[in-house]
């Protein structure tokens, strides 16, 4: 008696495109990155069972995408994403804030927060190559979209697997912020309503991690993660994470979320973990600094290629994220002033939406 062994089919369909040549392709890429990132966060933090996800590939990295018909919670998040996409298509969406909290009656008191900032361009991003005397030498269009997308997803997976566990029972919330100068005051995405509360509070001292940015000729998306400091497991023994005794997180006029220490005790230092590609940034900022791309950012990098190639089938220990660690009752505030002016006599309300 002979047996025929069936080989597992090779995944040929990739989620992300190789080339982005028009605005529609760019829009699809940003939508997919949002869906991948938010689905990956819920999967790697153990918020839903594995049956709630379908499997896709980003390069050689297997990712888990929420399926709308799998469970009510997954269906709700998919509906949130559809609301995000509506605002994104209209070029209204400025930022998506995905927060994790423990008290169902107090969604402003969070334990973890993920920020996705969106920008739109007309002629496509350009990067300047400058000489030592500051003179611009040349310009070229950014065309490394797929590689930067793969690296951003990989960084997210590596970070999620090195974070300490969440409490047993947690909830999700989403806030949407807009470009107020172009967004009609009456506009609300499907499934969202206006939010009157502009403050988030952390139970323990938070730390911000800058994950990275993906740039296309028509959009850019930047991702940051804010979590409790003691939840971060160091990648290296000599890594220092800059902290302060009390934090405020503000949204400036251009939508940049800047962190400041009330007691001015934060070290103005950046620590870059080269192996994981994750930047721990705690430098005090009051406004967004323009990011200057260097030639190395977009040139062929063997080390970067190696990081992408060795990321297939990262294993996840779901129990690690659900162990119910007990937190001390320390409070840190993240304040989101709804003002577009530095010191207005009567503050203007910045438009913010939350799910209905």
UniProtKB/Swiss-Prot annotation:
<dbReference type="InterPro" id="IPR003511">
    <property type="entry name" value="HORMA_dom"/>
</dbReference>
<protein>
    <recommendedName>
        <fullName>HORMA domain-containing protein 1</fullName>
    </recommendedName>
</protein>
<keyword id="KW-0744">Spermatogenesis</keyword>
<keyword id="KW-0896">Oogenesis</keyword>
<feature type="region of interest" description="Disordered">
    <location>
        <begin position="333"/>
        <end position="356"/>
    </location>
</feature>
<dbReference type="GO" id="GO:0048477">
    <property type="term" value="P:oogenesis"/>
</dbReference>
<feature type="compositionally biased region" description="Basic residues">
    <location>
        <begin position="347"/>
        <end position="356"/>
    </location>
</feature>
<comment type="function">
    <text>Plays a key role in meiotic progression by ensuring that sufficient numbers of processed DNA double-strand breaks (DSBs) are available for successful homology search, promoting synaptonemal-complex formation independently and playing key role in the male mid-pachytene checkpoint and the female meiotic prophase checkpoint.</text>
</comment>
<keyword id="KW-0158">Chromosome</keyword>
<dbReference type="GO" id="GO:0005634">
    <property type="term" value="C:nucleus"/>
</dbReference>
<dbReference type="GO" id="GO:0060629">
    <property type="term" value="P:regulation of homologous chromosome segregation"/>
</dbReference>
<dbReference type="Pfam" id="PF02301">
    <property type="entry name" value="HORMA"/>
</dbReference>
<dbReference type="GO" id="GO:0051598">
    <property type="term" value="P:meiotic recombination checkpoint signaling"/>
</dbReference>
<dbReference type="GO" id="GO:0005694">
    <property type="term" value="C:chromosome"/>
</dbReference>
<dbReference type="InterPro" id="IPR051294">
    <property type="entry name" value="HORMA_MeioticProgression"/>
</dbReference>
<feature type="domain" description="HORMA">
    <location>
        <begin position="24"/>
        <end position="225"/>
    </location>
</feature>
<dbReference type="GO" id="GO:0051321">
    <property type="term" value="P:meiotic cell cycle"/>
</dbReference>
<feature type="region of interest" description="Disordered">
    <location>
        <begin position="282"/>
        <end position="305"/>
    </location>
</feature>
<keyword id="KW-0469">Meiosis</keyword>
<dbReference type="GO" id="GO:0051177">
    <property type="term" value="P:meiotic sister chromatid cohesion"/>
</dbReference>
<keyword id="KW-0539">Nucleus</keyword>
<dbReference type="InterPro" id="IPR036570">
    <property type="entry name" value="HORMA_dom_sf"/>
</dbReference>
<dbReference type="GO" id="GO:0007130">
    <property type="term" value="P:synaptonemal complex assembly"/>
</dbReference>
<keyword id="KW-0221">Differentiation</keyword>
<dbReference type="GO" id="GO:0007283">
    <property type="term" value="P:spermatogenesis"/>
</dbReference>
<dbReference type="GO" id="GO:0042138">
    <property type="term" value="P:meiotic DNA double-strand break formation"/>
</dbReference>
<feature type="compositionally biased region" description="Basic and acidic residues">
    <location>
        <begin position="288"/>
        <end position="298"/>
    </location>
</feature>
